[in-house]
A protein has these predicted regions:
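Class I S-adenosyl-L-methionine
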Residues: 2, 57-67, 77-249, 255
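Class I SAM-dependent methyltransferase "Motif I" SAM/SAH-binding loop
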Residues: 9-14
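Glycine-rich SAM-binding Motif I of class I
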Residues: 15, 19
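A short, Lys/Arg-enriched amphipathic alpha-helix followed by its capping loop at the start of a domain
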Residues: 20-27
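Conserved SAM/SAH-binding beta-strand->alpha-helix loop
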Residues: 35
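Conserved SAM-binding loop
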Residues: 42
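Conserved SAM-binding strand-loop segment of SAM-dependent methyltransferases
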Residues: 47-54
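C-terminal target-recognition/interaction regions appended to catalytic cores
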Residues: 207-332
Length: 332
């Protein structure tokens, strides 16, 4: 396990990185998150109240650590945003990570951002990150991974970046490809106690006729969202999907009656997903305590990293014996 490893959790959100690192028994020695609601959820679950604005924290005041975890703010690079990148103050927060890494020289940086980060500004944004970390003393690797391939029924494509301190002599790193798991959204749904507010009752619901969703020869359904209808004009947040496929990407923002979770035909009803179902398809543990306000929970999971993807990356790092541990498996 990673019981001898100390890490810091920057732009911590509700602790997706914490969930993954904790499953290997690593020790969180510092967390930072400016959002008050996320601070509340983080402290409720991990007993640590994150510090606020990282730009106001001197690197000397941060404890020594082996790993930096950071899902740095993505709105500046998101397809759904204005894509201003480093021109947006949120985009420049990457350099806070570099500042801390330069001072502390941890062994590994584990970073995450939206898929569009790879292509933003014709690849220049990613190039700046790569060059900055290389100049800080690291070998840099990245890959876009889809959560659908890692045991959760949510299409969520994100770029994952791993940087190894150069003296570790990691000259190549192969990211995990995922697992072949025949799961569907239906497997992750709550069976009872669904809030009536989640159900959509409207006259402008249109379902495609004679749709037959069949498994393949191995009994597996398509590992992607399957659209089967619309509400209103079928714009973003107005599309209906089958639970026999995967969920669309959870979103912190967006409009439409199905905003943030999408709409699904479950039995005879059309409804949004519950906060508990969002927890499940993001891979957070059963013990995780949701924020008491559903609207806040939706936003938090819409911004979160998917935990099983991080676990797989960590296992890949361990298989390379980079952190010299005695176990390759995360706790369940």
């Amino acid at each position: 396990m990673l019981s001898h490893i100390k890490y810091i959790d920057l732009f911590a959100g509700i602790g997706g990185f914490h969930q993954a690192m904790d499953s290997f028994n690593a020790e969180c020695v510092f967390a930072s998150e400016w959002d008050k609601d996320c601070q509340y959820t983080y402290e409720e679950n991990y007993g640590i109240k994150p510090y606020g604005d990282i730009t106001q924290i001197h690197e000397k005041d941060i404890p020594e650590h082996d790993v930096i975890c950071a899902g740095f703010p993505c709105q500046a690079f998101s397809i759904s945003g204005k894509q201003q990148g480093f021109e947006d103050s949120r985009g420049t927060l990457f350099f806070e990570i570099a500042r801390i890494a330069k001072y502390h020289q941890p062994k590994i940086l584990l970073l995450e951002n939206v898929r569009n980060f790879e292509k933003h500004d014709n690849g220049n944004t990613l190039h700046i990150v790569k060059t900055t970390l290389e100049e800080t003393g690291y070998n840099f690797f990245y890959k876009v991974l889809n959560a659908s391939n890692f045991g959760v029924p949510q299409k969520r494509e994100r770029i994952f970046m791993v940087a190894f301190r150069k003296d570790l002599n990691v000259t190549s790193f192969i990211f995990p490809s995922g697992i072949n798991s025949p799961i569907t959204l239906q497997d992750f749904l709550e069976k009872k106690g669904i809030d009536e507010k989640l159900i959509i009752k409207r006259d402008d619901i249109t379902l495609k006729e004679n749709i037959k969703i069949k498994p393949d020869m191995f009994g597996h359904y398509p590992q992607k969202p399957i659209r089967i209808g619309t509400v209103n004009k079928g714009g973003q947040g107005e599309r209906i999907y089958s639970p026999l496929g995967h969920a669309i990407t959870l979103s912190a923002y967006g409009g439409g009656v199905g905003a943030k979770t999408g709409l699904y035909k479950i039995g005879d009803t059309i409804r949004r997903l519950s906060p508990e179902e969002c927890r499940r398809i993001t891979g957070f543990s059963k013990k995780f305590k949701l924020h008491p306000k559903p609207t806040v929970s939706y936003r938090q999971f819409g911004n979160s990293v998917v935990v099983p993807v991080l676990k797989s990356i960590l296992e890949q790092i361990l298989q390379n014996n980079i952190l010299k541990t005695d176990s390759l498996k995360a706790a369940s």
